[in-house]
Amino acid sequence: MIGKLRGIVDSTGEDWAVIDVGGVGYHVTCSSRTLRNLPPAGGAVTLSIETKVSDEAIRLIGFTTDSEREWFRLLLAVQGVGTRVALGVLGTLAPADLARAIALDDKKAVSAAPGVGPKVAARIVTELKDKVPDSMGLSAALEVGVNGEAVSSVSAPARDAVSALVNLGYPQAQAMGAVAAAAKRLDDAASTEQLIRHGLKELAR
């Protein structure tokens, strides 16, 4: 199995790139985001590779980051999501944006991807909620802070608030989404108690 390619961009197409590695050209299927991030022909590139083997062919799927590849694998585990749809989602949403959409139950953001209707978007959000690593989901959900301004890191009160809600019996994904929503309503100095209180209000809606 091929896990990584390091070489030169030979050529690109609508959904593929040919990477020259030591004189051998590898045809790699890519999302639109990956293609946008590739250097021009002749430029050096390293791609994380997911190898798909079928009776007809061996297919290489390329990603500019390991995170994108991991998300691709998660998406393929969702009922009704194949390679084309998964790449469509990753072409529309960066890993952090996808994690945020799932943590905040934002089906509309997911359905913006080509080939993803409301039902598939709902399945993606529902089936992946508990599969997103805790730190990834919380960090992504809180990345956009008050008034939409980015924050550099997740505060200790936010982490404590999520832990408290989980201890109260709420699922991890719901707790993260509630605290993220509460954090957007409060200022950066919000205490754990404030985040818990407002988080509970979000969960009661």
UniProtKB/Swiss-Prot annotation:
Coiled coil: none annotated. It comes from the Bacteria. Keywords: Cytoplasm, DNA damage, DNA recombination, DNA repair, DNA-binding. GO terms for molecular function: ATP binding; four-way junction DNA binding; four-way junction helicase activity. Pfam families: HHH_5, RuvA_C, RuvA_N. It is found in: Cytoplasm. GO terms for biological process: DNA recombination; DNA repair. GO terms for cellular component: cytoplasm; Holliday junction helicase complex; Holliday junction resolvase complex. Residues 144-152 are annotated as: Flexible linker. Residues 153-205 are annotated as: Domain III. Residues 1-64 are annotated as: Domain I. Residues 65-143 are annotated as: Domain II. Its main location: cytoplasm. The RuvA-RuvB-RuvC complex processes Holliday junction (HJ) DNA during genetic recombination and DNA repair, while the RuvA-RuvB complex plays an important role in the rescue of blocked DNA replication forks via replication fork reversal (RFR). RuvA specifically binds to HJ cruciform DNA, conferring on it an open structure. The RuvB hexamer acts as an ATP-dependent pump, pulling dsDNA into and through the RuvAB complex. HJ branch migration allows RuvC to scan DNA until it finds its consensus sequence, where it cleaves and resolves the cruciform DNA. Belongs to the RuvA family. NCBIfam families: ruvA. Has three domains with a flexible linker between the domains II and III and assumes an 'L' shape. Domain III is highly mobile and contacts RuvB. Homotetramer. Forms an RuvA(8)-RuvB(12)-Holliday junction (HJ) complex. HJ DNA is sandwiched between 2 RuvA tetramers; dsDNA enters through RuvA and exits via RuvB. An RuvB hexamer assembles on each DNA strand where it exits the tetramer. Each RuvB hexamer is contacted by two RuvA subunits (via domain III) on 2 adjacent RuvB subunits; this complex drives branch migration. In the full resolvosome a probable DNA-RuvA(4)-RuvB(12)-RuvC(2) complex forms which resolves the HJ. This is Holliday junction branch migration complex subunit RuvA.
